[in-house]
Amino acid sequence: FSNTGFALIYNDDLYKKKIVSKKLENRDLLIFQKNLKKGTKVRITNVLNKKTVIAKVGSNSKYPLFNNSVVSIRISKELELDIDEPYVEIVEILNNSMFVAKKAKTFDEEKNVANKAPIDSISVNDLNAKKNKKKKISKTANFNYIIKIADFYFIDSAKSMIQKIKKETSLNKNKILLKKISNTQYRVILGPFLNKKSLQKAFNDINILNFENIEIIKNAKNS
């Protein structure tokens, strides 16, 4: 399993407001992810800066459809996530993976150091305050995403999916596109979206069709 999308950075207000149904501790190396079983090991990558951590999936928790996961404050700090653009890739790691063995060992060593450092006082705003000041000017210009619905082997299958989306949703028809990846791969996408609000609305609208693994993908500048 793999998925790219926007994580939700946990804080207690989300639990109090019932946006998420379970708690995460600040120090946890846990995430909530609805497609994966509790205890599954995952590699989480901040796609924007390529920083990576290994974590485990926690208990089943409700959280907004738009988000592909809920991550602890500790994970967000390790990845240096941008609160306005917490774009991550989540990859399930198989138990027999050599990568897991290496990373788990390294992370255990890091954990001994990290556990000694106070983290309870860190807020989501604190994590990104300095970075936001530097990036404020260019952030809007760099926000450009598409929603990947599915890949198809046959172009007719992809076209049928587009017709289904047009018929059964209220999405802007000009945003529903067919992209040829190769001679045997045709991708149905929505977009592009140049701000988070429009991206989130389209993502929530398409979810009435109950697709299993919709992904949000950073759009290449000239695509």
Give the location of each predicted region:
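Extracytoplasmic
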Residues: K139-F143, Y153-S223
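Secreted/periplasmic proteins
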Residues: F1-I146, Y153, S157, I216-A220
